[in-house]
């Protein structure tokens, strides 16, 4: 899939910039054992300071043990490192896996039980529901390097939907009623926002005096079909000095129903067209 990316070249003779469009061909491959280290790095990035709580090594192995489910994005052939991954895990089937148990416990503790997201999580992650033979929940794992364009996400989600359909047609355990998406966000305080020169989006949230922004641009579209969502502080977050400059990181969880999966894919296909620009 060719996508045009802008490459900025500084002009040493002036303060201006010449902008050149560079076409990058992204290739999609199923997750494979050769991707172990790169996928583990992406998971560490996704879970940020709390990654150590989830036995990321075992979670990586679980992801790579699923044939035919999920995709990675590479630019230099199948043997190169992936720059992005999208997959889904059956929380019910894997409820006793150490990583899934840790993630389930973590989310139930992080999100207030009385909130809409807390109620939704309790409805689908209680021990009785997890042990049921139907009404399963899929944990969507989605992460990419920060410079990867969101235009890679529509085909990845479209392929994931097709893979899940094929799997359920073969009676494999990928029939879900709901999905949980774990994501990341960050915030500046108002003074830092002005200092960066970043234009403020039309839709924004105030959180502890700062502007909440998404690392994953597609979160905006997932929220349109979501049952509930919540942001939470990392347990092992890095504290900044009062005068230090940077961003505060936070976690995000979004719950949406299977009935809205195709609607969500259509939204991101319209929001992130993959044609050359």
Where does each model-flagged region fall?
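Intrinsically disordered, low-complexity, positively biased terminal segments
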Residues: 2-277
């Amino acid at each position: 899939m060719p996508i045009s990316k802008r490459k900025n070249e500084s002009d040493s003779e002036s303060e201006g910039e010449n902008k050149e469009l560079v076409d990058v061909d992204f290739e999609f491959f199923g997750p494979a054992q050769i991707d172990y280290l790169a996928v583990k790095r992406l998971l560490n990035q996704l879970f940020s300071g709390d990654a150590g709580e989830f036995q990321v090594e075992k979670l990586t192995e679980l992801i790579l043990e699923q044939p035919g489910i999920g995709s990675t994005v590479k630019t230099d052939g199948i043997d190169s490192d992936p720059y992005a991954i999208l997959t889904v895990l059956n929380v019910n089937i894997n409820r006793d896996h150490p990583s899934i148990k840790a993630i389930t416990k973590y989310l139930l503790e992080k999100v207030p039980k009385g909130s809409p997201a807390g109620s939704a999580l309790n409805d689908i992650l209680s021990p009785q529901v997890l042990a049921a033979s139907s009404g399963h929940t899929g944990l969507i794992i989605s992460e990419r390097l920060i410079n990867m364009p969101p235009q890679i996400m529509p085909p990845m989600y479209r392929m994931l939907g097709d893979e899940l359909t094929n799997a359920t047609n073969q009676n494999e355990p990928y029939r879900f009623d709901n999905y949980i998406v774990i994501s990341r966000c960050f915030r500046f305080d108002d003074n830092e926002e002005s200092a960066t020169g970043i234009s403020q989006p039309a839709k924004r949230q105030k959180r502890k005096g700062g502007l909440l922004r998404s690392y994953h641009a597609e979160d905006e579209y997932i929220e349109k079909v979501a049952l509930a969502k919540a942001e939470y502080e990392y347990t092992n977050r890095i504290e900044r000095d009062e005068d230090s400059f940077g961003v505060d990181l936070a976690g995000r969880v979004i719950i949406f129903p299977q009935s809205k999966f195709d609607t969500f894919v259509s939204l991101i296909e319209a929001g992130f067209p993959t044609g050359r620009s």
